[in-house]
Each structure stands twice: as C-alpha cells, then as structure tokens.
C-alpha cells in the first residue's frame, strides 16, 4: 500500500504541525489504511491491530477531523483509569487549535455538568455509562465516540458495560472502535455497522519462541522461525534474562501471581552484579521510592533493595505512587527488569526488548482449586509488549513450559491459532438485568417496544434475549426498581437512586433485604454485609486465616454462614474486608494493617475506595426506604471510611489539608473542631509548622464562616 506522509494528509495545516512536532513524518501501514478507508471523512471503523501500531494517532485524526468539519463533541472511552490520564496528557496538544480537553472518571453519583464546556472528553466505560444513567444533557452533543481497548468486551467483568456503551454510541454518532487483534472482526464490524482495518503490522518485528529445560544440558528455546538458542544456568528465566541484558535489552517477566512476581524479582536481583547498570540513577530512583506517601514501609524497603540492583516487581497490590515511579524508570531504561502480573499487559504502554511468559496456567476465579490455560488473547497482550520502537530491531516473546512434551501444544495454541472471538457477556442475569435498568434510566421512560429494540441491538443471540428479557422486567418490577405507566416503563424512586449510585441491582436488593430485618448491627456486621454483595471487593484468605477471622468476631453478623464452598469463600473474604475496614476507621497504622492482613498498599486503597462507594450507596438505600435505624450509622461509617478516623475526628477532617494523622495530633492537644483551630492559630502553627499551619487556619475559618 502506498504510504501517506503527514504533509499529504487532507487536514488543516495546524493539525499537520502538531503531528510533525512529535517527530512523525509519515503514517505507518495501519494508519494509512485507516485514512484510505475514511477515517478523516467520519466513517465508522473497527481498527484491530497489535499493540504499539499507532491507534492513538488514528483516534486523534478521527476526532479532530470531525470537530473541525462538523463541530459537536468527541469522547474517548477507555477501560482503565490509568489510560485516561495518559490519553488526556496526549490530547492536550489539541488545545493549540482552540479545543478544550477534559477528563473524568470515578464519582458515579453526578452528571458532571462542567463538561458541557469541553470539546474532547476522556473517560472510562463505567463513567460514561453512569453519565447516561443520569441523563446528562451535554451528552446529547457527543457525536463522535472512540471506544478504546474494545476487546475488553470479551472480559467477564467489564464486557457488559463495554457492550452497553457501544449499543448506545452506535445509535448516537460515529464510532471508532480500537482493539487488539480479535478472532471475529468481520462479525463485530457488521454489528457496529463499521468497515474494518485489520492488520498484524508491528513497528518492531516480533520473534516468538517456547523455552523448556533439559536438566543439566541447559535450556532450549525453539523459535517460530525454526531457529534455536541454548542457554546455561540453573533457572531458565534468569538465564534468558541475563542473556538479553548482556545484549543491552530490557526484560518484562510475566508471572501468574503477585507472590511469583516478587520472588522472581528477588532471584533475578541476585545476579545483577553481572550487568552494566547506572548505579547513580538507580539510587536516585530508589530514594524516590522511599518518599512515596501512599505506600507501606515494608514494600518500600523491599523495592528499594531491588531497584538499586536494576530490578522491580509490579502488580495491583502496589500503590499508584510506587507503580508510577517504576514505570517511568523502566521507560527511561534505568530499571532493566520488571517482573509483573498480567495486569501490566492490559495497562499503560511499557515495551521491552523481551517478554517472558513464565506461566501459561492460572487459577480459575470461579472454580476453587481448578487451573486453566491463559487465552490466546492474553498471550497476545503480553507478547505485544516485546520490542521497543527506536531501541530494538526486533522484540522477543518467550513462553516457558514445564517440559518438552508441552511444546507442540503451546506453539499450536499461542503462536499458530487465531485469537478467540469476541462474544457478548450479557448472557447472565446479573449483567443483563443491570443493562436493562440502565437503559430505562437513561431514557427517563421508555416503551416496551423501544426497550426491546435496544436490547435486540446487542451481540447477544435472539434466543438469549428472549430468555432473559421477560425475566428482567419481572424481577425489576417485583423488586420495585421499575413500574409500568400506560405501556411505558419508568424507574421508581428506589430504582432511580440505585441507578444513579451505579449499584448493581442485586447489590441493592441484598442490602435492602438484610437491612430490613437487622436491628442494631455492629460496624463489622455492616461492613460484612456490604462487602458480601456482588459489587464488594474480593481478597484472598489463607486457610490459616479463616478460623482466626471467625474466632476474632465479637458481634453477630447479619448474614448466616453458607454451606456452599464457593459462597463460603466469598463470605470469609467479605469478613476479612470488614476487619480491614474496622481497623482502618479505628486509626490503626497503615503499615500494621498491611502486615496484619498480608495485603499491599494498592489493595488497601482499592478496598477503601470500593467500600466508601458501597457504604455511601447503602446509606442512600436505607434513607430512601426510611430505614432510619440504619441511615445515620451508615452516613457516619461512610465518612469515617473516607478519612480512616474514629467518629471524634470527623469535625477536624472536614478541614482541607487535615488527614487522619494531623487530626489525631490536633485532637490530642485539645484542638477538636474547626472553631478551635481558628481560636488557637499559634498553637496550630507550632504543631503543624508555620506555612502549613497558616493554610489550615485559613481553611478552617472558611468552613465556619
């Protein structure tokens, strides 16, 4: 295909200047094909190409061309909050043309009216879904939708929301769907009424292989091109990593669990004295790790000792502050090796010369004790990180297998097979009922014919639509989420609040049913109930922890212990979450919580954020149902979770700049309310320091004014 230079693009010269300022002189093959298929002329496209093939620039060309030629608003939707920040930063370039760029995520109980003044909006699928539920007026102005990481429609948890957003988007404006390579692109494109741009082109060629051990003979890598490589050493991952490092490359090692990622990093670090490193920059990076505030002391110490050796681990248990430093240092080629869980493959763009997939088996989340092979899609996501443009003339993706017997099976599944097809994930009661509720919420009121028309526009088979539709209407009516009025379906007051709060209807019903029968639960019982809902956070519980959690329980729970093994697993997980939260609101030191429960700072933050939202939801559910004996308690618990304090500190933490530690310091010195801060400014300054003290006094005065 004839290439297109940036200068040849049929766009405004200012658009060309911005693209050229990034060092881009010509379009790559996928970008060229997209332009030739109508990207700049507002055509609907499904672009399915490997990682790092320039999909972001395609999105920018599509959005900016639309805004310049037709006006309106463009929205860029991604499944991950980390990606919203990354894309927002990139899109800020277009403010040079006079376009305002905004970003929003989280806080599902608002319609964000301030966004009406923005031209390009970056958000998550969940946030856009919640905005539609709130019937935000400014959403009607959006007529260009970029649906990023569209293959997430195949994800069991996120898929229903991605599909729901696509159903609405394709009725409202132009869609540009960006996806990794998928197995049924033609079917998906037909459903979206879009043309396809599908290619396996990569900016850096990929060399794939499978590695197995032959005992004392060493480790053999069989590459897909027929070549082989033989390595010496006790451990195959270490042997391969050192081989790549000796050639000036970087390595990402994917492991199936956090524990494996951490122990692998520690093993590799012991051999890094053979590798050329920039000790000064590594020490500077390690010192920055020490300064991160949203992380535990132990994990900072462990990472410090690894980073000075050029190695780090990366997983969701780490705080955002730690992950950001590790990612930046790896991009700057200071850290040479990252060992990670597969979540890194789905997140921010972080390429390396070589990628090792250390485990092709993982535990099934639904069936206790059952393992399964990772999908071909997951392998492609991980291998897609191999090869760094501008640094590597090729990338390598190596799969580690347990024995030579597995080699042929692995090559066939991951190197020679098509990726799994995208299928609807609305085919279960929970996601389907929630989808129907969201449609009614976004419409205000809707006829059954129009609602059926929406539902039949999903990728779900007509047979399954018929199976679930009547059940959904019956269940939502029976549980008082919706009501019928002259052949029109509307939300009840309860249904509207649940939808606005972005609660799963099954979560709302669970909370409603148990609160109605509970009299005066303890804090642990409230937390356990809320964590036991479908929206609740899950944490792993060791066998030795189960008895201890139950033995330490000193009050009665609202929910009886289940007999079913899987349900008991969820039940005991919810109990662990409840104990973690109880310690948090009793002002137990964060390091103590992390150590006591064996979690990371990222886990603690995720638990706090999720439970703060759900407790806020439970408060509103109890309020709208006039369950007054619970309402005031839940309101206080929500506020205490937000700040991690005892009830006596709630007044102080209202003041911006005062968190749990400063509030306790002030309280213990007799400063217990904002009024006390204003009355004793010199005492506050002596406790908090002159500059901070002055700011706190001003904020307190503003609050009580």
Curated annotation (Swiss-Prot):
UniProt binding sites for ATP: 31, 49-56
Motif extent (DEAH box): 148-151
Alphabetical list of Gene3D superfamilies matching this protein: 1.10.3380.30, 5' to 3' exonuclease, C-terminal subdomain (1.10.150.20), P-loop containing nucleotide triphosphate hydrolases (3.40.50.300)
GO biological process terms on file: DNA repair
Domain spans labelled Helicase ATP-binding: 36-200
InterPro entries: DEAD/DEAH_box_helicase_dom, Hel308-like_dom4, Hel308_helicase, Hel308_SKI2-like, Helicase_ATP-bd, Helicase_C-like, Helicase_Hel308, HTH_61
HAMAP family noted in UniProt: Helicase_Hel308
Catalysed reactions, as listed in the record: Couples ATP hydrolysis with the unwinding of duplex DNA by translocating in the 3'-5' direction; ATP + H2O = ADP + phosphate + H(+)
Species per Swiss-Prot/TrEMBL record: Sulfolobus acidocaldarius (strain ATCC 33909 / DSM 639 / JCM 8929 / NBRC 15157 / NCIMB 11770)
Subunit structure: Monomer.
Highest rank taxon of the organism: Archaea
Protein name: ATP-dependent DNA helicase Hel308
Family assignment from sequence similarity: Belongs to the helicase family. Hel308 subfamily.
Function: DNA-dependent ATPase and 3'-5' DNA helicase that may be involved in repair of stalled replication forks.
GO molecular function: 3'-5' DNA helicase activity; ATP binding; ATP hydrolysis activity; DNA binding
Cited PANTHER family: ATP-DEPENDENT DNA HELICASE HEL308 (PTHR47961:SF10), DNA POLYMERASE THETA, PUTATIVE (AFU_ORTHOLOGUE AFUA_1G05260)-RELATED (PTHR47961)
Pfam families: DEAD (PF00270), Helicase_C (PF00271), Helicase_dom4_arc (PF21280), HTH_61 (PF20470)
Keyword Glycosyltransferase listed: no
SUPFAM superfamilies cross-referenced by the UniProt entry: P-loop containing nucleoside triphosphate hydrolases, Sec63 N-terminal domain-like, Winged helix' DNA-binding domain
Phenotype upon gene inactivation: No visible phenotype, non-essential it can be deleted. Greatly increased sensitivity to mitomycin C.
Keywords on record: ATP-binding, DNA damage, DNA repair, DNA-binding, Helicase, Hydrolase, Isomerase, Nucleotide-binding
Every Helicase C-terminal domain range: 236-430
EC assignment: 5.6.2.4
């Amino acid at each position: 295909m004839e290439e297109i230079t940036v200068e040849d693009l049929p766009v405004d010269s200012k658009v060309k200047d911005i693209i050229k300022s990034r060092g881009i002189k010509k379009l790559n093959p996928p970008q060229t094909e997209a332009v030739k298929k109508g990207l700049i002329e507002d055509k609907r496209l499904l672009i399915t190409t490997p990682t790092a093939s320039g999909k972001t620039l395609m999105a920018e060309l599509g959005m900016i061309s639309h805004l310049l030629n037709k006006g309106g608003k463009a929205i860029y939707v991604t499944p991950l909050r980390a990606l919203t920040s990354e894309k927002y930063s990139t899109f800020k370039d277009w403010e040079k043309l006079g376009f305002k760029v905004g970003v929003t995520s989280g806080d599902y109980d608002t319609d964000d009216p301030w966004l009406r003044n923005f031209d390009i909006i970056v958000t998550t699928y969940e946030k856009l879904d919640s905005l539609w539920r709130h019937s935000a007026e400014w959403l009607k102005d959006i007529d260009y939708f970029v649906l990023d990481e569209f293959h997430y429609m195949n994800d069991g948890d996120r898929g229903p929301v991605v599909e729901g957003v696509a159903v609405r988007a394709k009725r409202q404006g132009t869609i540009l769907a960006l996806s990794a390579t998928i197995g049924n692109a033609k079917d998906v494109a037909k459903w979206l009424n879009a043309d396809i741009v599908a290619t396996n082109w990569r900016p850096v060629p990929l060399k794939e292989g499978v590695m197995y051990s032959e005992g004392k003979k060493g480790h053999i890598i069989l590459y897909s091109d027929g070549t082989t490589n033989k390595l010496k050493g006790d451990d195959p991952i270490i042997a391969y990593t050192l081989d790549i490092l000796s050639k000036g490359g970087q390595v990402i090692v994917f492991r199936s669990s956090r524990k494996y990622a951490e122990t692998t990093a520690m093993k590799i670090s012991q051999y890094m004295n053979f590798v050329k490193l920039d000790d000064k920059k590594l020490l500077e990076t390690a010192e920055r790790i020490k300064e991160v505030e949203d992380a535990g002391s132990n994990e900072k110490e462990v990472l410090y000792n690894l980073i000075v050796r050029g190695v780090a681990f990366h997983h969701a248990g780490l705080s955002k502050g730690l992950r950001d430093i590790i990612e930046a240092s790896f991009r700057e080629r200071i850290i040479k090796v990252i060992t990670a869980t597969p979540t890194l493959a789905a997140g921010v763009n972080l390429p390396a010369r070589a990628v090792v997939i250390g485990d092709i088996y993982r535990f099934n989340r639904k069936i206790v004790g059952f393992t399964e092979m990772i999908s071909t899609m997951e392998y492609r996501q991980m291998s897609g990180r191999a090869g760094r443009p501008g640094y590597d003339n090729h990338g390598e993706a190596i799969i580690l297998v347990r024995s030579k017997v597995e080699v042929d099976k692995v090559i066939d599944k991951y190197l020679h097979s098509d990726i799994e097809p995208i299928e609807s994930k609305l085919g279960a009661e929970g996601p389907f009922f929630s989808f129907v509720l969201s449609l009614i919420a976004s419409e205000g009121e809707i006829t059954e014919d129009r609602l059926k028309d929406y539902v039949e526009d999903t990728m779900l088979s007509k047979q399954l639509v018929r199976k679930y539709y009547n059940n959904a209407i019956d269940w939502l009516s029976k549980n008082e989420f919706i009501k019928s009025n002259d052949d029109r379906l509307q939300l009840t007051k309860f249904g509207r609040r649940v939808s606005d709060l972005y609660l799963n209807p099954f979560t709302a019903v669970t909370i409603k049913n148990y609160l109605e029968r509970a009299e005066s639960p303890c804090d642990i019982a409230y937390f356990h109930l809320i964590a036991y809902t479908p929206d609740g956070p899950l944490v792993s519980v060791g066998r030795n922890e189960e008895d201890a959690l139950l033995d330490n329980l000193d009050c009665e729970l609202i929910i009886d212990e289940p007999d079913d093994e899987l349900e008991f697993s969820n039940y005991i997980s919810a109990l662990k979450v409840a104990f973690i939260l109880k310690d948090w609101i009793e002002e137990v030191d964060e390091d103590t919580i992390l150590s006591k429960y064996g979690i990371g700072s990222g886990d603690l933050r995720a638990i706090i954020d999720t439970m703060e939202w759900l407790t806020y939801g439970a408060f509103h559910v109890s309020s709208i149902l006039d369950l007054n004996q619970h309402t005031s308690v839940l309101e206080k618990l929500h506020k205490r979770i937000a700040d991690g304090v005892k009830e006596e500190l709630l007044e102080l933490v209202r003041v911006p700049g005062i968190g749990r530690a400063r509030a306790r310091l002030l309280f213990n010195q007799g400063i217990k309310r904002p009024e006390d801060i204003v009355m004793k400014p010199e005492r506050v300054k002596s406790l908090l320091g002159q500059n901070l003290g002055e700011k706190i006094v001003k904020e307190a005065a503003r609050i009580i004014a």
